[in-house]
Amino acid sequence: MTTWNKCLKKLKKSLSTFEYKTWIKPIHVEQNNYLFTIYCNNEYFKKHIKSKYGEIISSTIQEFHDGDLLIEYSNKKFSGEKSPEVTSVGPQANFFNQKNVEIKDDSEETSLNQEPKKSQKKLSSKNSASQELFGFDEAMLITDKDDQEYSFGLPLKEKYVFDSFVVGDANKIARAAAMQVSINPGKLHNPLFIYGGSGLGKTHLMQAIGNHAREVNPNARIIYTNSEQFIKDYVNSIRLQDQDEFQRVYRSADILLIDDIQFIAGKEGTAQEFFHTFNALYENGKQIILTSDKYPNEIEGLEERLVSRFGYGLTVSVDMPDLETRIAILLKKAHDLGQKLPNETAAFIAENVRTNVRELEGALNRVLTTSKFNHKDPTIEVAQACLRDVIKIQEKKVKIDNIQKVVADFYRIRVKDLTSNQRSRNIARPRQIAMSLARELTSHSLPEIGNAFGGRDHTTVMHAVKAITKLRQSNTSISDDYELLLDKISR
């Protein structure tokens, strides 16, 4: 058995199946006494292998080779007779001083017993071929801690998991769909299109899908990115005349997750490339998950053929969570941070921060940090003081009659129509919206709200809240109206 075949045997056990087949197996190694020439086929492959696997290759060869050693990396194809199973891999090695070992490539040579040259530092930096072509480097590969398998794309953050996602009426359908596709990708809801305003949890759900899918199937090739990076990758592939590699990477995914897909609208070349990528993945039963700030039909400048394909699967919304869910988010976040947050303080913050979850958590962090530095408990008084420049604390609480007036003006009806017994659709729907807003924006009980709307029963209010919450999930017009009214009343 040759030295390299012995190395292969060990490398196959040391690396994951995915790594071995993807990066080691395609390479060829030629040995001439102390010289091992590693043929990597192209510059991209060579640089990635040197930067990622050079150390393990170097140490493995040293283990089976006696005497001096020179390892040479080449971006050329192997022209001689193919070895039984030849490969090459590896970042520039963090070399050992046991033997005189050198690493060499087409343009540089570095002795293991020397200080690295500037060119070596440059090579081992983020200026690898993959960084130049795809805009990501070794640190931006999705990594599973146990088996070290990699997929291209932006990194998935460990904190974004389903368990840390607080579920409420405004997001429960999206969360359920996300969980389903993470368990059975490509079989249900393909594509899954999640839309909603900024900071409402779309990215959290998307990354939770990736993290959970990797737990279910560690061998899955998961690519998570955003439209900005996708556009950059595509432009770079044209500049480097390597569109084939771009297509190979993105179309090899088992699960493709792209955040903020709306930004490819109007980018003709990128949109066309994404269209073909979508088709290739969809036809092969691969899962596609997309997020946007708008419903597909409402994305200005988006090609009709893409709008049509986005409708192949399931489209779900995430909306601003209601008061109870906002309180739950704050309490969970505080608990995760190891901090105690009184319920009344959580309620105060939730009542006054109604823009999005990101700002809600930001307000919480400010309250907790301020109270900690001042050695005080995070009371309502502390929250009022430190959030004065973040939220406009209303001099007086929102009143139901003000909600009724704003809603009536918005729908061009009379306030007395909202409190009347009329059941026509153009009156009943605004009435339900006004009740739902009153429930979210005031501290009034259900019976009190019902009484303010013509003496209605509390069950009527409950029904109205549930109906509007459900409609906001499926009806973009209702969802947009609700958000506009929420903004008007909260000013």
Curated annotation (Swiss-Prot):
SUPFAM superfamilies according to UniProt: P-loop containing nucleoside triphosphate hydrolases (SSF52540), TrpR-like (SSF48295)
Residue span of region Domain II: 69-154
Stretches for region Domain I, interacts with DnaA modulators: 1-69
Pfam families reported in the protein's UniProt record: Bac_DnaA, Bac_DnaA_C, DnaA_N
Alphabetized InterPro entries for the sequence: AAA+_ATPase, Chromosome_initiator_DnaA, Chromosome_initiator_DnaA-like, Chromosome_initiator_DnaA_CS, DnaA_C, DnaA_dom, DnaA_N_dom, DnaA_N_sf
Record: residues binding ATP: G199, G201, K202, T203
Keyword vocabulary terms for this entry: ATP-binding, Cytoplasm, DNA replication, DNA-binding, Lipid-binding, Nucleotide-binding
Main location: cytoplasm
One GO term of the biological process aspect: regulation of DNA replication
Gene Ontology MF: a single term: lipid binding
Annotated region (Domain IV, binds dsDNA), positions in chain: 372-491
GO CC list: cytoplasm; plasma membrane
Entries under SMART domains matching the protein: AAA, Bac_DnaA_C
Annotated spans, Disordered: 106-126
Region: Domain III, AAA+ region, residue numbers: 155-371
Subcellular location: Cytoplasm
HAMAP family: DnaA_bact
Notes concerning its domains: Domain I is involved in oligomerization and binding regulators, domain II is flexibile and of varying length in different bacteria, domain III forms the AAA+ region, while domain IV binds dsDNA.
Quaternary structure and partners: Oligomerizes as a right-handed, spiral filament on DNA at oriC.
Function: Plays an essential role in the initiation and regulation of chromosomal replication. ATP-DnaA binds to the origin of replication (oriC) to initiate formation of the DNA replication initiation complex once per cell cycle. Binds the DnaA box (a 9 base pair repeat at the origin) and separates the double-stranded (ds)DNA. Forms a right-handed helical filament on oriC DNA; dsDNA binds to the exterior of the filament while single-stranded (ss)DNA is stabiized in the filament's interior.
PANTHER family with a match to the protein in the record: CHROMOSOMAL REPLICATION INITIATOR PROTEIN DNAA (PTHR30050:SF2)
Similarity remark: Belongs to the DnaA family.
Protein's recorded name: Chromosomal replication initiator protein DnaA
Gene: dnaA
